[in-house]
């Protein structure tokens, strides 16, 4: 800061960017004219070599940008202005309400209740889940392949384990007579000879006296 006669204020130091002739946000380079205009909307406007630059968008909530030499470049505002213009044009094609900014606030946009959007969310998220499952299958395949330090990992068949668990949990009841398959002898001969008559009956041949099943 400067006091009377252009001298630095007592007890302070003068920054290089604030000296006249040095380019930067706090001073003007030679041949440049800077005009500060305070807007009623609390953002400043500067004109440098006929180019108007403001901090309307970049300075909101971030005063530290004022210390950046590139803070007054018009690219910031130009990019945001182009984006807002595209938002307005896209909104005009799909909606008839007055302003597209209403869609930024749920209480003003008249959005549907989330319960009615469940099917829409499912339609959006389903491709992501399918792609995730597909990627997992690919990873499982590569994981099962042998490596120099690991043997091949075989897929576990779960239905065999579940069947063994059900058999282990089985307990005989009174309806079963309190017996299990292990209570029966394993020496029953189920061999049915050709002369037993049962085969003839199944084939529609004349019925003959069936021979009894032999139990050894």
UniProtKB/Swiss-Prot annotation:
Catalytic activity reported: O-phospho-L-tyrosyl-[protein] + H2O = L-tyrosyl-[protein] + phosphate; O-phospho-L-seryl-[protein] + H2O = L-seryl-[protein] + phosphate; O-phospho-L-threonyl-[protein] + H2O = L-threonyl-[protein] + phosphate
Superkingdom of origin organism: Viruses
Chain segments carrying region Disordered: 1-50, 165-187
Keyword Hydrolase tagged: yes
Active site, UniProt feature: 95 (phosphocysteine intermediate)
Keywords noted in UniProt: Early protein, Hydrolase, Protein phosphatase
Induction: VP1 and VP2 are detected 12 hours post infection, while VP3 only after 24 hours.
Biased composition (Low complexity): 21-32, 178-187
EC number: 3.1.3.16, 3.1.3.48
Gene Ontology molecular function: protein serine/threonine phosphatase activity; protein tyrosine phosphatase activity
Function recorded in the entry: May act as a scaffold protein in virion assembly. May also play a role in intracellular signaling during viral replication.
Family the entry assigns: Belongs to the gyrovirus protein VP2 family.
UniProt-recorded name of the protein: Dual specificity protein phosphatase VP2
């Amino acid at each position: 800061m400067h006091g009377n006669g252009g001298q630095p204020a007592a007890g302070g130091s003068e920054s290089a960017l604030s000296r006249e002739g040095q380019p930067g946000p706090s001073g003007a380079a030679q041949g440049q004219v800077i005009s500060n205009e305070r807007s009623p909307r609390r953002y400043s406007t500067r004109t440098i070599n006929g180019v108007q630059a403001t901090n309307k968008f970049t300075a909101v909530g971030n005063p530290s940008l004022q210390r950046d030499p590139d803070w007054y470049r018009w690219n910031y505002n130009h990019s945001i202005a182009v984006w807002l213009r595209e938002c307005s044009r896209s909104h005009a094609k799909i909606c008839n309400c007055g302003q597209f900014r209403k869609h930024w606030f749920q209480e003003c946009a008249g959005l549907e209740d989330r319960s009615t959007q469940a099917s829409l969310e499912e339609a959006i998220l389903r491709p992501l889940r399918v792609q995730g499952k597909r990627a997992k299958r690919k990873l499982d395949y590569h994981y099962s392949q042998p490596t120099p330090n690991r043997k091949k990992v075989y897929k576990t068949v779960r239905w065999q384990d579940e069947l063994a668990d059900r058999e282990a949990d089985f307990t005989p009841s009174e309806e079963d007579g309190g017996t299990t398959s292990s209570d029966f002898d394993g020496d029953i001969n189920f061999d049915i000879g050709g002369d037993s008559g049962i085969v003839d009956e199944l084939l529609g041949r004349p019925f003959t006296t069936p021979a009894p099943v032999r139990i050894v």
